[in-house]
Curated annotation (Swiss-Prot):
Gene3D superfamilies: 3.30.70.100. Belongs to the UPF0734 family. It comes from the Eukaryota. InterPro entries: Carb_Metab_Mutarotase, Dimeric_a/b-barrel, Rham/fucose_mutarotase. SUPFAM superfamilies: Dimeric alpha+beta barrel. It comes from Dictyostelium discoideum (Social amoeba). GO terms for molecular function: racemase and epimerase activity, acting on carbohydrates and derivatives. The lineage of its organism: Eukaryota, Amoebozoa, Evosea, Eumycetozoa, Dictyostelia. This is UPF0734 protein DDB_G0273871/DDB_G0273177.
Length: 125
């Protein structure tokens, strides 16, 4: 697969507003379990980054063009008990974003709309 076979995604989620829990969450992500990374790669994720601002998480990832977050993230938790354990463990730190329209709520992470891409304008030149 070349870079044309991948698509970009962005999702958002909040952390529980507790400084100790946030620090613990960050520590876990410095040492993500090997099985979690392997499971993410096996469902077609090429790149993934999570950013934090206060209690707000922003996740950017690139996945194969036919990736479906609703289906493939479910597969990820089913692939290995460790991936499922990780997902359940992270839930103690996380909470859904409370102030977004109901139609934009995801299963857990909420999908974000792309409103700007520099590549749109590079193609015009």
């Amino acid at each position: 697969m070349d870079s044309c076979d991948y698509k970009s995604y962005a999702q958002a989620l909040d952390l529980v507003n507790d400084k100790e829990l946030i620090e613990e969450y960050k520590k876990y992500h410095k040492n993500v379990w090997k099985e979690v990374n392997e499971a993410l790669c096996s469902i077609g994720i090429k790149k993934m980054k999570i950013f934090l601002l206060g209690t707000h998480l922003f996740m950017y990832y690139e996945a194969r063009a036919d990736f479906d977050p609703k289906i493939d993230f479910q597969k990820y938790t089913e692939l290995t008990p460790k991936a499922n354990e990780w997902d359940n463990l992270m839930r103690k730190f996380q909470q859904k974003i409370s102030d977004i329209p109901e139609n934009q709520l995801g299963e857990w992470w909420s999908p974000m709309d792309l409103v700007y891409d520099l590549d749109w304008f590079k193609q015009q030149q």
